[in-house]
Amino acid sequence: MRLHHLLLVLLFLVLSAGSGFTQVVRNPQSCRWNMGVCIPISCPGNMRQIGTCFGPRVPCCRRW
């Protein structure tokens, strides 16, 4: 029975950890949460796009 509980806990940890990697930056709050900045033009040379802020035209940029 202890093994059953251990496997259940491991399954929960694997599923909960995987859900964080599938989230996409789509609004200003999640952009700031991911250490990004909303820039109304394309990202500068020292930054890369990690998502969008207000639709497809405003990128969320973060430093490399």
UniProtKB/Swiss-Prot annotation:
<dbReference type="GO" id="GO:0060326">
    <property type="term" value="P:cell chemotaxis"/>
</dbReference>
<dbReference type="InterPro" id="IPR006080">
    <property type="entry name" value="Beta/alpha-defensin_C"/>
</dbReference>
<comment type="function">
    <text>Has bactericidal activity. Active against E.coli ML35 but not against S.aureus 502A.</text>
</comment>
<dbReference type="InterPro" id="IPR001855">
    <property type="entry name" value="Defensin_beta-like"/>
</dbReference>
<comment type="similarity">
    <text>Belongs to the beta-defensin family.</text>
</comment>
<feature type="signal peptide">
    <location>
        <begin position="1"/>
        <end position="22"/>
    </location>
</feature>
<dbReference type="GO" id="GO:0031731">
    <property type="term" value="F:CCR6 chemokine receptor binding"/>
</dbReference>
<feature type="disulfide bond">
    <location>
        <begin position="38"/>
        <end position="53"/>
    </location>
</feature>
<keyword id="KW-0873">Pyrrolidone carboxylic acid</keyword>
<keyword id="KW-0211">Defensin</keyword>
<dbReference type="GO" id="GO:0005615">
    <property type="term" value="C:extracellular space"/>
</dbReference>
<keyword id="KW-0732">Signal</keyword>
<dbReference type="Pfam" id="PF00711">
    <property type="entry name" value="Defensin_beta"/>
</dbReference>
<protein>
    <recommendedName>
        <fullName>Beta-defensin 5</fullName>
    </recommendedName>
</protein>
<dbReference type="GO" id="GO:0042742">
    <property type="term" value="P:defense response to bacterium"/>
</dbReference>
<feature type="disulfide bond">
    <location>
        <begin position="31"/>
        <end position="60"/>
    </location>
</feature>
<keyword id="KW-0964">Secreted</keyword>
<keyword id="KW-0044">Antibiotic</keyword>
<keyword id="KW-1015">Disulfide bond</keyword>
<dbReference type="GO" id="GO:0042056">
    <property type="term" value="F:chemoattractant activity"/>
</dbReference>
<feature type="disulfide bond">
    <location>
        <begin position="43"/>
        <end position="61"/>
    </location>
</feature>
<keyword id="KW-0929">Antimicrobial</keyword>
<feature type="modified residue" description="Pyrrolidone carboxylic acid">
    <location>
        <position position="23"/>
    </location>
</feature>
